[in-house]
């Protein structure tokens, strides 16, 4: 037996993680059962920890003591099998980054004066008229003085020449206020794009560590760094706010040879803004003048600032270019030249073409064609609110003579289609779309007898790819915001479809930083706009704030890593105390009885967001909405389990007590002695899924829910919070046929309507493109892709929670056959079934070192050993 897939802090061969204890995990290959393991952690010739032979089948452990900063370490592991025979050693490497006190450099700011920017370029041509109109209206209203339009800025370039000694180990530690790209002696450092990533950058930043041993030579070296605006000061969110975290971009770096700094960021540098990137903005786009390629000019001195901002290590996976798609040229009815890349994605377009000097080419990126087949961005629906007239997603290339090759550096866009505006002859031109997202392997695959369902799963994966660029976001176009509610409903599915633990863990750190002192949760982390009048009120919303509990809990249950609970425990406690505090404000006029003070009726909630037939305002203003009380019960139970896992028995008892009182409060306030009388599907789904009713009451509620779905023509009528549970609760209480009819429904509202409309990602709303072909809202939102959780966990029945693997498939002739494959933290799990007449054959694969408790629809229960089984 041998250990495989070794990970350190859920990362493969990490470089530059924070110092501290290490979470070490592995999988087992060969053999049946691991009976013991032995681990050795070393740094050079020094042994940092040796476990000795540790008995047990667990496939993870934590080092008992912290690993220091700047440690280039290795760990190796061997396993004993069921016959007590040891296998061969397996080895992995890791490296910790700088501690805060190790940084010797200062922040270097390249901009010393306002740049001279041509306002006739692409970005300003779009934004300036709208800006001036809004400012004139502001002044006319007497609410403020009109401000002049500020053009988007060029990228800055910084250079430094330094001398390096010979050495065996050379590291570049670097971060930026903004985005950076670095070159050593003319060669690009690393392959991460949009570095250093997305942070609440006025509170902390993360730094990357690069192994530059092959790039730094003995003697003289040249370092070049490009800086863009990035998340730091670009236009952001639906409001189009700029400078959210600061007004000046800057870089901080330290280059070491064998552990000693030989080059740091300081005032002994030069900078210029005269490079080819004339304007850059994460949301709006880039202007690139190829005539300025080559030797840079206009070098000047820099400014510096002390380094007082907390800097963490590279505790996540890098953002990289991933799949590439060639564009298909088409002509629209309006005569537009449009490229169709065939896949909605987040990324950018690379172009190669021949032109004359000064000729221009402009690209506008969007998700859809309109009902007439013409290019549109109107589905972004942010034109009126956005300070620059909406999300531009523009690229402009000013060509040099001859061959031109341009790929954006400091922007990202959500698109499938690109409109091309140019007088250049495009014969022989090449346009390639690059998908850009965090390095996350796909871990879940599903196939069945219905091609549309297969496409739904593919769409869900692509929406996850398009919205996991360093942090999970709602959409890659209009908002690009790390909404808590979206992650709360999708986390279980997301962990199955892709190995996203590091991305979500990083985002939780942003949630902690942005939590209000009174416990309410920022709906978006990091922030994408300046807070408005309603912001603090909406940040008390149940379901959204509960992501503080739901998300760490899900990460823990999949991996067994208690550190994720410990890191976020205070955030969970503060949120839950705030939610309970809302309940404690309940007055006798609102609710009476022994459990009135556990009924959440005060404050503002988003409610059952995007529920068909209910406007957002109706969802929020319903004075008797049950959402808050339901989550007080549900999250309280989870928090009790979390406290127990952390060894906090008193806390656990307190949270269990509160949760059970909230259950009784729910029954008192929102049921008639356990009977739900609502005409909304969501009320039944939530009450059943959250175990707010007794077993017989849940069955009665499911009976009613089934009837409501049938009377609605087998269409769902649920919204944001309850849709992920809909098919699950129907199938659990005997209505699998109804669940399958919902799954296979292809008229709106349904999951397959968008597939029939040609979608390649999941939409924000059920009718993102209506029956007339008119697009609206975001066409790349992962939230409703949560149905895939039921395909894996219901249709094929795979459930992994810590050490426990259960498989309980729910076959149905409507699909004919189905198979799910999950490359889980404990190894590959497979579950499939196929009909042959009335007979069903099941095929199940259990990974090494696990057993599976299998329950079949005919009532049989089996315990399966590792291997593939046909039943």
Please describe what each predicted stretch is.
Residues 179, 261-266, 272-273, 425-459, ...:
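Active-site acid/base region of carbohydrate-active enzymes
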